[in-house]
Amino acid sequence: MLEQAPAEVKQVIESGGVVAYPTEAVYGLGCDPDNDAAITKLLAIKKRPWEKGLILVASDYQQLLPYIDDSQLTEEQRERVFSKWPGPFTFIMPIKPGISNLLCGSFNSLAVRVSDHPTIQAICQQLGKPLVSTSANHSGEEPAMSHEEILAKFEGEIDALVAGSLGEQRKPSTIIDAISGKILR
């Protein structure tokens, strides 16, 4: 496994690799949202059932539009979302037809976040699209909080590590239903 800068990890992601990187609260694992083989690999590493779905993180709202059905949001709902972004708020949004079940799981919606974390911003800007994101842990275990923990837990399983500082959050992102405004976590 190779430690890489955000600008260097683009090739790993585009070739179907799974990468680890710091987020607002914990280290995350991610991959290309348009590569089902990469998503399957990520789910296998985490030992996570596909039915639970995953989160997409992006550097801006435009990157999410190929995946979410923005037309189902009212202007008021859109303004509520934009008032929280970029930041540690994940919104559940309606999906566009044809989105992989590996992303949305058994739901007809998708969890998405525009992150203000500089590493996520840099990776997504390099890719020109969002990144699948999930906490860096095997299901049922605590998430990794440092690049040393990543190396200890995932050596030989992931393809790259972007070391860096975690954000200021001490808990996972708040999850909000974009349509109803209900806080889910």
UniProtKB/Swiss-Prot annotation:
It is found in: Cytoplasm. HAMAP family: TsaC. It comes from Shewanella woodyi (strain ATCC 51908 / MS32). Belongs to the SUA5 family. TsaC subfamily. It catalyses: L-threonine + hydrogencarbonate + ATP = L-threonylcarbamoyladenylate + diphosphate + H2O. Disulfide bonds: none annotated. GO terms for cellular component: cytoplasm. Residues 3-185 form the YrdC-like domain. Its EC number is 2.7.7.87. This is Threonylcarbamoyl-AMP synthase. InterPro entries: DHBP_synth_RibB-like_a/b_dom (IPR017945), Sua5-like_dom (IPR006070), TC-AMP_synthase (IPR023535), TC-AMP_synthase_SUA5 (IPR050156).
